[in-house]
């Protein structure tokens, strides 16, 4: 439900591209009506809320079927700034097969402490599962290399899906490149969050446990074999 901010987000993005896909994840407010006012916006919509992971999958699938080679994901809550899109695109122009990660500045005094803890928690598990250190594994502002990723989509359906995608991309030796972005943090009474602290924290913890086990039997061996094969071919 993003009727308050989605119009501003679309207008901001339109300054940089006309190719916009809006995924309406079963909103129950006026989000769909607001989006329908824009001419030429591609909308993927379904009636039941399926979670962020499902929405990402639908959006990436749609972009791929439309012939796009890359796709930028940006949240509809207004926290991400469209003016950072060129940064991600410029980095991708030099690393076309890489997954570009919009990395937030954690020295921002307006960043909630809960966000800082969640990111440190996520970064720790990501390094354990991949051997790679990243400054921000929680950000939703990313540029995905669709052709390189192929049919890779998250199995999980909610917030944990973004971490899952990073881990699986790392296991496939897809280069992960962080690029610094700015983030707007509104006053507490204006913040929109669909994160369910108890239930989603348990889901993320279960996912991390599963990924650690998979990393031992598949992730690390796969990374080693792929690197060895790449070295052999070169």
Predicted regions and their residues:
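Hydrophobic helical membrane-anchoring modules
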Residues: 131, 154-234
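Short, well-formed alpha-helical segments that are part of the catalytic scaffolds
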Residues: 1-16
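A conserved acidic beta->alpha catalytic loop
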Residues: 24-33, 78
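Acceptor/aglycone-binding surface of glycosyltransferases and processive sugar-polymer synthases
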Residues: 48-65, 82-159, 186-195, 199-205
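Acidic helix N-cap motif at the loop->helix transition within catalytic regions
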Residues: 4-8, 29-37
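Short beta-strand-to-loop acidic/aromatic patch adjacent to the donor-nucleotide binding site
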Residues: 68-79
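Residues at the starts of beta-strands that form the adenosine-phosphate
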Residues: 19-20, 70, 175
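Short loop->beta transition adjacent to catalytic acidic/histidine clusters or analogous donor-positioning motifs
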Residues: 12-22, 30, 41
């Amino acid at each position: 439900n993003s009727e308050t901010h989605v119009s501003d987000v679309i207008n901001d993005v339109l300054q940089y591209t006309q190719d916009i896909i809006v995924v309406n994840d079963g909103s129950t407010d006026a989000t769909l009506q607001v989006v329908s006012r824009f001419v030429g916006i591609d909308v993927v919509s379904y009636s039941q809320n399926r979670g962020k992971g499902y929405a990402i999958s639908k959006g990436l699938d749609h972009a791929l079927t439309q012939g796009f080679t890359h796709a930028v994901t940006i949240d509809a809550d207004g926290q991400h700034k469209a003016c950072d899109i060129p940064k991600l695109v410029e980095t991708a122009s030099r690393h076309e097969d890489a997954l570009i990660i919009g990395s937030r500045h954690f020295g921002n005094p307006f960043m909630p402490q809960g966000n800082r803890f969640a990111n440190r928690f996520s970064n720790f598990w990501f390094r354990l599962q991949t051997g790679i250190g990243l400054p921000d594994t929680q950000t939703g502002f990313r540029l995905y290399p669709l052709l390189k990723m192929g049919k890779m989509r998250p199995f999980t359906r909610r917030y944990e899906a973004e971490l899952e995608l990073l881990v699986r991309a790392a296991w496939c030796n897809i280069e992960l490149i962080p690029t610094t972005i700015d983030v707007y943090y509104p006053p507490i009474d204006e913040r929109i969050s669909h994160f369910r602290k108890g239930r989603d924290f348990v889901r993320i913890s279960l996912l991390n446990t599963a990924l650690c086990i998979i990393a031992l039997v598949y992730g690390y061996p796969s990374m080693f074999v792929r690197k060895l094969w790449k070295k052999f071919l070169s």
